[in-house]
A protein has these predicted regions:
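Glycine-rich phosphate/pyrophosphate-binding beta-alpha loops
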Residues: 134-136
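Conserved post-catalytic alpha-helical subdomain immediately downstream of the catalytic base
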Residues: 146-171
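Extended hydrophobic-aromatic, low-complexity segments
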Residues: 88-89, 127, 138, 159-163
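Glycine-rich phosphate/dinucleotide-binding loop and adjoining beta-alpha-beta core of small-molecule
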Residues: 1-131
Length: 171
């Protein structure tokens, strides 16, 4: 695990073949610099988990994010709450239909956080977590979930299984 704060550090991360996952979003800021870092990671061979500010930074041009994800062969996962989902994908329709559409249109496994967290895969699979709690609405809880997803991905779990297992473990 490493914290990345400079271009040199991201270059070191990308050249270190022992690293296989990057998580970006928690604790970042919203804006063009974050977009640039996300796109740089998405052009790498690392599995990438995008959360929080990494998602919100693309709210003005979500297609830029989706195109970068679709162009890669390595996995990408989006862990969003309702607000981030609405900013990227719109907010009309049933929650299950929206998360399935979001996963298909972004070509990423999408986690929609909430008391009934949903996980969707681009092929149309979807699960609803029945293990959730209102306590998950606590600030920082989603950062923990994103970290769990990244940790399980780093152990070579498939994106689908990593997301489902992380959601279940998280509660």
């Amino acid at each position: 695990m490493a914290s990345i704060d400079s271009t040199t550090e991201i270059d070191n991360l990308l050249s270190d073949h022992r690293k296989n996952v990057a998580l970006i979003g928690p604790g970042y800021s919203v804006g063009p610099a974050t977009c640039s870092w996300v796109l740089r990671l998405l052009h790498s061979s690392l599995s990438v988990v995008l959360d929080a500010d990494a998602l919100t930074s693309f709210s003005a041009d979500p297609q830029l994010l989706f195109d970068a994800i679709q162009a890669r062969s390595a996995p990408a996962l989006l862990t969003s709450h309702e607000g981030e989902m609405t900013r990227l994908f719109g907010g009309k329709g049933a929650k299950i239909a929206r998360v399935i559409d979001a996963s298909a249109s972004s070509s990423a496994v999408v986690v929609l956080k909430g008391a009934d967290t949903l996980v969707a895969a681009p092929d149309g699979r979807v699960v609803i977590n029945i293990n959730g709690s209102p306590w998950l609405a606590t600030g920082g809880s989603g950062d923990v979930l994103a970290g769990l997803v990244a940790g399980l991905l780093s152990q070579c779990m498939s994106p689908w299984h990593a997301a489902c297992a992380a959601v279940w473990l998280h509660g």
